[in-house]
């Protein structure tokens, strides 16, 4: 990618108090070097060990009397009708690596990509998260029902269930949640091998900078997907606030003051990381700042598809009532849909050129780049209309979902690494949705030592 993106990978943690984690010592942070020897082998998706469902499925609801529409969700998509005169994403395959994508009448083209959670094919979704993400990418319009639609309704989706907060390993009653950086790496390899031109990842591992994770397999898989298979990879930046979210990071964070490391976002040369803004284009209060944030899209009070029916929903149920569906998880699929539109419109562009185009056509903040919105809020019409590829905006810094500390490790061999990831696998994927108010969910989604965040 650009030199500025490469430079943003070199970050130094500053002294900061992280809730429950003490004050980390400042030291340099960067992802492990890409080593193709860590690339997962091609294999049929399957859980690393037997699992069982331990939690009831997530409740989703539609607010009574509310009219759903595109305009309420994202100002940057207000020109979708004009965009669709140029492209609707036909011919593109977008992989959703998430909690599964349920079959829905408004998602007519879903390919079962496999299941790392249970014994399914990837098209079950007990958490609701993956289906919400998929709807934002590709929901077909239905003018007789509402004004909601996905960004790229003609794409084919590849559903890979990689994580769930509702399942747990058999024989481990203290563990809740499945999904880790190893299964994420395998899922990325699978998505690339299934021909995905765009891969959406709305989950992350979020850790103190002093405890950077050993995610070499994931790094190798990301490099394989981008450099070998020419896939665009889009990831959520992550959320702060509440026990089930990432530790906060200063809004003005620079590469010299990072306290929270995020994977896969810190592989900035391979991942387009997306922060969240509100309907007015202002950074969401929950969006996690970081020197690897590239662009932003609307992620507040979104509407999408129900995994348990044939309608649309806009609220998540919880112990204390329902809450709006919000989070950087739902900003990322806006950008994934846009990437698919660009790839359909300009099929000769490489993955890196598509990522650069999205950054270059965004509405840049006053400084050209900042840690909350990166190069700015995406502009779908500009991205698919311009024949030229402008230079990326000025970048000086670089972000992911629910917080999970990962202990620093020495350099283990593959067998040692598998053992260490056994504990990591027991951590819940913290759905990037802003669900901090759900007390029981917060306890479930924030493991004691390790985990992957999501929303």
Swiss-Prot record:
The entry's cellular-component GO terms read:
plasma membrane
Keyword annotations: Cell membrane, Hydrolase, Membrane, Protease, Serine protease, Signal, Transmembrane, Transmembrane helix
Query: What are the TM regions of this chain, as residue ranges?
Result: 432-452
Source domain of life is Bacteria
Protein name per UniProt = Mycosin-4
Please state the protein's primary subcellular location: membrane
EC class = hydrolase
- Domain Peptidase S8: from-to ranges: 74-384
User: Can you supply a Gene Ontology BP term from the record?
Assistant: protein processing
Where located? Cell membrane
Q: What EC numbers are recorded for this enzyme?
A: 3.4.21.-
A Gene Ontology molecular function term of the record: serine-type endopeptidase activity
What are the Low complexity biased-composition ranges?
394-412
Q: Where is this region: Disordered?
A: 389-417
Q: Signal sequence: where?
A: 1-25
Task: Name a Pfam family for this protein.
Answer: Peptidase_S8
| Induction of the gene | Constitutively expressed during growth in culture.
> Whose protein is this, by species?
Mycobacterium tuberculosis (strain ATCC 25618 / H37Rv)
């Amino acid at each position: 990618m650009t030199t500025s993106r490469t430079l943003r990978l070199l970050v130094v943690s500053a002294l900061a108090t992280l809730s429950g984690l003490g004050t980390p010592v400042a030291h340099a942070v960067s992802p492990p070097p890409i080593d193709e020897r860590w690339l997962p082998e091609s294999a049929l998706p399957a859980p690393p060990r037997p699992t069982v469902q331990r939690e009831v499925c997530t409740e989703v609801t539609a607010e009574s009397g509310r009219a759903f529409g595109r305009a309420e969700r994202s100002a940057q998509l207000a020109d979708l009708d004009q965009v669709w005169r140029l492209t609707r994403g036909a011919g593109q395959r977008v992989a959703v690596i998430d909690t599964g994508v349920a079959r829905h009448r408004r998602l007519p083209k879903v390919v079962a990509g496999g299941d790392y959670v249970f014994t399914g094919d990837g098209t079950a979704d007990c958490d609701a998260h993956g289906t919400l993400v998929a709807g934002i990418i590709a929901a077909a319009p239905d003018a007789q029902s509402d004004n909601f639609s996905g960004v790229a309704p003609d794409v084919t989706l590849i559903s890979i269930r990689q994580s769930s907060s509702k399942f747990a390993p058999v024989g481990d009653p203290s563990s809740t949640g499945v999904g880790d950086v190893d299964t994420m790496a395998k899922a990325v390899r699978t998505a690339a091998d299934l021909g995905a031109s765009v891969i959406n990842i709305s989950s992350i591992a979020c850790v103190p900078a002093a405890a950077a994770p050993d995610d070499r397999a994931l790094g190798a898989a990301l490099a394989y997907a981008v450099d070998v298979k020419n896939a665009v990879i889009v990831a959520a930046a992550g959320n702060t606030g509440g026990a089930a979210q990432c530790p906060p990071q200063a809004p003005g964070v620079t590469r010299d003051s990072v306290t929270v490391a995020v994977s896969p976002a810190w592989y900035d040369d391979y991942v387009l990381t997306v922060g969240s803004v509100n309907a007015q284009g202002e950074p969401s209060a929950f969006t996690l700042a970081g020197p690897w944030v590239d662009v932003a899209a609307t992620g507040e009070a979104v509407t999408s598809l129900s995994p348990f029916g044939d309608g649309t929903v806009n609220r998540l149920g919880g112990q204390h009532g329902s809450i709006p569906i919000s989070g950087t998880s739902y900003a990322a699929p806006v950008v994934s849909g846009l990437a698919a539109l660009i790839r359909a419109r300009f099929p000769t562009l490489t993955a890196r050129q598509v990522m650069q185009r999205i950054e270059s056509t965004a509405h840049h903040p006053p400084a050209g780049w900042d840690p909350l919105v990166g190069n700015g809020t995406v502009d779908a019409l500009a991205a698919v209309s311009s024949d030229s590829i402008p230079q990326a905006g000025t970048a000086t810094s670089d972000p992911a979902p629910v917080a999970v500390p990962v202990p620093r490790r020495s350099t283990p061999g593959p067998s040692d690494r598998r053992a260490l990831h056994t504990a990591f696998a027991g951590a819940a994927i913290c759905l990037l949705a802003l669900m901090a108010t759900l007390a029981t969910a917060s306890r479930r989604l924030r493991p004691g030592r390790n985990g992957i965040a999501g929303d």
